[in-house]
Amino acid sequence: ACGIEIALETNLCPSDFEYLLENCPPDIGVNYDSGNSASLGYDVKQEWDTYGAKIINVHIKDRLLHGPSVPMGEGDADFDTLAKMLSKFDYGGNLILQVARGESGKEVEWYHKNRNFLLDRGIG
């Protein structure tokens, strides 16, 4: 009633996360993280088809499979499918850049590089 939304972000596979959500109050949402998904080897389409209607927040980053965050476009995140899912589910929530840091002192340059990377894929 006070305008606060609660979202869960986990490393559970889609079916286990779906089970968790089914056992939570219906107003609990999902914070989706593209990098964590890539790191765990999950299928973006399967995740969104499983609980996309409950996604209220999206963290955007790139990660290697079973590895760390890397600059956008250098990891295993499936941004093309993510763009399709954002459109399919008419997502209108936050897109939060949680990207790997570039060279110190060049934050503005890195911001524009990351933003353009996403815009080129229809995200944002």
What is each of the regions a protein language model found here?
Residues P14-Y32, N36-G124:
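Histidine-acidic metal/acid-base catalytic patches
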